[in-house]
Structures are given as C-alpha cells and as structure tokens.
UniProtKB/Swiss-Prot annotation:
This is RRP15-like protein. The modification Phosphoserine is found at S269. The keyword Cell membrane does not apply. Belongs to the RRP15 family. GO terms for cellular component: preribosome, large subunit precursor. Residues 1-132, 201-276 are annotated as: Disordered. It comes from Drosophila melanogaster. Coiled coil: none annotated. Residues 75-95, 226-245 have a biased composition (Basic and acidic residues).
Amino acid sequence: MALLTEKRVKKTHAPASDSSPEESDSEGSQNSASEAEGNAGWADSIQKVLKTTKPKTQKKTVLARAKKSQAAVRFQKDAANKKPGFDFEIEKADVKEEDEGDNHEDEKPQASALDATLTKQQRKNVPLQLRVKPSFRDMERERTLRKVATRGVVQFFNAVRIQQKDLQQQLEEAGPLDSRQDAVLNNINKRKFLDVLMSGKRAKSTPVDNAVKKEEQETDDDDEDKGSSGKKKSEWSVLREDFMTNKKIKHWDEEDDDEEGHNDEADDSDYDDGEE
C-alpha cells in the first residue's frame, strides 16, 4: 500500500512540473510583448498634456501648478508648524511666560521704530517751535538790547586794542633780550584786562527792564481800567455829574450880569459921545 501511494504522488507531481515551464514561457512572452508595445494610456495622457496651449491670462503652466496642490500646501504647513520633540515635559505656565517674552521681543522693534520716527519729526519741528511771533510791545525792549549789545562789542574790541598797544609798548621798552620780554609776557593779568574793559566810556550798566517804568505803566493801566468801568476821561464836561457843583461855574450868572452891565455902560458912553 505504501508503494502504491508513493507512485500516485509521483504521477501527480510529474504533470505539474511539465506544465510549469510552459506557463512560464507564456508569461515571459506576454511580458516581452507588453514591454515592446508600452502603456498606451500613459502615452495618450502625456501627449494631451504636451499638446495643451498655455492660456494668456495665466502665467503658470500646468505642471508648475501641480506644486501648489492642496496636499503639498498642507504638508508645508504641517512641516512649518511642527515643533521639535523633546525628551522632557514643559509646564504650561512656563510656556505662557516664554510666549509672553517672545511677544515683548516682537513688540520692542516696533516701539523703537516708532520712537525713531517721532524723534525725526521732533527734530524737524524744533526750529518751528523756537520761532516766536514778535509783539509790538517788545519793540522798545529789543531796541535797548540791541544798543547794549553793540556797546558791549565796541567796548570789547577797544579793550583788546588798548591791551595790544600796551603790550607792544612794554616789549619795546624791555629791549631785545628774551628774558625781559618773557617777564613782560608773564606779567599779563586777566584782571587788568577786565579793568580796562570796564573802565571805558561805553562801560555803563543800562537797565533793560526798568522797574519804576513798569510800576508807572501798571498804575496807568489801573487808572484806565477804573475810567473804563465808570465813564471815559475824554467826556464832555457838561455831562459830568459834578458839573453844577463845580466852584468855577458856581457864580456863572453873576459874572454874566457884570459883563452885561459893563457892556451897557460902554454903549451909553459911546452914545453920549456921539451926541456931543
């Protein structure tokens, strides 16, 4: 029985082995045929893509647009937002503090840029802010200041000229010896120059802001204010309240009578002379 079973198994395996090379030959021939023919669908699709014309309104070509597909964009966003992994854990409070610190660092350059622009604007506006519109009330003060300035400059140059003349004269008197000339130069004193400067004809202290004149102006202003509160000074004398009580016009009618009497007497005398 064992021998019969072995013979049957050999018979079954034998045709299988015979059929395998035939099948392999058929598969190889099909593969070679497919390689020779190629993929017709792929060739057609590539041909259509190559034949497509580029639209005038669109700058990018078909193949270049494929780079910006949704999948590629998502992948790039994920890669950008992806944080590096760490072996340790970070507490939430620390993360918030770091985020706040990053925000402050981001805000600092903006503030510095604003400060720079503000400083530039302020520098441009500084000359405009220093300009002051002159007032007619300050004209006299400006004139006095100009006079004082001119006098001071003239006095200063006169003092320098006098000092130079004195020094030249002393050097001539000292002679050609260097030791004597050095002694003369060492005797130059700052105090002497100031004495010469303050002893000139124009060396007079002129008060620019006169306190007495200011007080007089203030009193005049107060009087004007009082007069404006009541009645004006340049008012007709008849309209004043003390017109009738004034001593000068108290006996105005008597004076007129006396004048009329004198006039009548003069007329009578003239008339008598005419009759004679």
